[in-house]
Regions:
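Acidic-glycine-rich active-site phosphate/pyrophosphate-binding loop
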Residues: 31-39, 90-105, 143-149, 204, ...
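Short acidic, glycine/serine/threonine-rich loops at helix termini
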Residues: 18, 92-93, 125, 152-156, ...
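Conserved beta-ketoacyl condensing-enzyme motif
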Residues: 6, 52-116, 238-262, 266-268
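Claisen-condensing/thiolase-fold acyl-transfer catalytic domains that form or cleave C-C bonds
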Residues: 57, 61, 87-88, 101, ...
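Condensing-enzyme catalytic core mediating Claisen C-C bond formation in acyl metabolism
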Residues: 1-52, 157-225, 233, 328
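Buried hydrophobic positions in well-ordered alpha/beta secondary-structure cores of metabolic enzymes
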Residues: 6-8, 37, 67, 78-81, ...
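Acidic, glycine-rich active-site loops and adjacent beta-strand->loop/helix elements
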Residues: 12, 84-89, 116-119, 145-151, ...
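Flexible, glycine-rich active-site loops centered on histidine and acidic residues
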Residues: 133-167
């Protein structure tokens, strides 16, 4: 029986770095002290686009070219391309069309864009893995996740403005006879917070017709801790149905949205520190690509090796949580 493995992974981020002092000073001028907030979120610096010629699409193109080079492949070797983003540079055509053109992929290559907000790239990899297992004609897939977060971050709200960074990540999935790769995934969706994080703030229709602001995300306060009990239940069920325990997990690549969330999950399961891959202090929160940038850095540092069981966990606005098991 075939399996789907991660053949290669690479990233791209802008060169421009902004450290915490900029945001501390920005909000001090508004009469707010965000130093404790930055500590809770685990922020130190972030990469932010500062060139007019850069955007979410250009970042994705660069990450794509890098991962193809790393894998020793060309666009002609790809059967499937999926672009995960919540900040698409265009909606007509889809962003994946530009990726297809840039790498000169074949005419029979399937292409699509997808959006599951911050859970997007994890969802895309999970769905592509299952599709590849079901379709005998699909042997390779490119999944690229890219969000130009700073473009729509709200300078009046530290939860986005001081918390987000810009980056792209690309992975190559490959069908293999090796006993490795995709294991399983589980979802939990509760739409209770559907009106708490909005962009455009009042919908596309009003934004296009000039009846509301389209410049930034509007984020209303809510208690994100409600996502933790279903997270624990979901992870427990996912491990149990695959004959695993938390001790069998070699590395954890979680959403980098908030260090506090990672620490709560770590404490709940008593996960060893060396298994927690944290990159939010360097990259801040990169949205859709977040858990996979953690994977990239874990591999790069030697903390994640071939054969390791990796647990992914992430959350999308609204909210939807996703946990995925992959043997790297």
């Amino acid at each position: 029986m075939p399996n789907i493995k991660i053949k290669a992974i690479d990233i791209y981020h802008p060169n421009h770095v902004i450290e915490n002092d900029f945001y501390i000073n920005h909000f001090q001028k508004k009469g707010r002290d965000i130093q404790h907030f930055l500590e809770v979120m685990g922020r130190e610096k972030r990469y932010v686009i500062d060139k007019v010629e850069e955007n979410g699409l250009t970042m994705a193109l660069e990450a794509t070219k890098r991962v193809l080079e790393r894998a020793g492949m060309t666009g002609k070797d790809l059967d499937y391309i999926e672009f995960s983003t919540q900040v698409p540079e265009t909606t007509f055509p889809i962003n994946a069309m530009y990726v297809h053109a840039e790498i000169q992929a074949d005419h029979d290559t399937i292409i699509k864009d997808s959006n599951a907000n911050c859970a997007g790239m994890t969802v895309a990899v999970e769905q592509a893995s299952r599709y590849m297992l079901a379709n005998p004609h699909i042997h390779t897939a490119l999944i690229v996740g890219s969000d130009y977060n700073s473009l729509i971050a709200n300078p009046e709200q530290e939860i986005t403005y001081a918390n987000y960074g810009d980056a792209a990540c690309a992975v190559i999935l490959e069908k293999t006879d090796e006993n490795t790769g995709f294991i399983d995934a589980s979802y939990h969706t509760d739409s209770v917070f559907k009106d708490k994080i909005n962009y455009p703030a009042h919908g596309l229709t009003k934004a296009v017709k000039g009846k509301s602001d389209v410049q930034a995300i509007n984020w209303l306060p809510f208690d994100g801790n409600v996502a933790l009990p279903p997270t624990y239940k979901m992870i427990d069920q996912l491990l149990a149905r695959n004959g695993l325990s938390i001790k069998d997990i070699d590395a954890c690549c979680f959403s980098q949205f908030a260090l506090s969330n990672i620490l709560k999950i770590q404490d709940h399961y008593q996960i060893d520190q060396e298994k927690i891959i944290y990159v939010g202090d360097t990259y801040a929160y990169t949205g859709t690509s977040s858990p996979f940038i953690a994977l990239y850095e874990g591999i790069k540092s030697g903390r994640i090796k071939r054969g390791d069981n990796v647990l992914f966990w992430t959350i999308g606005s609204g909210f939807q949580i996703v946990a995925m098991l992959y043997q790297y």
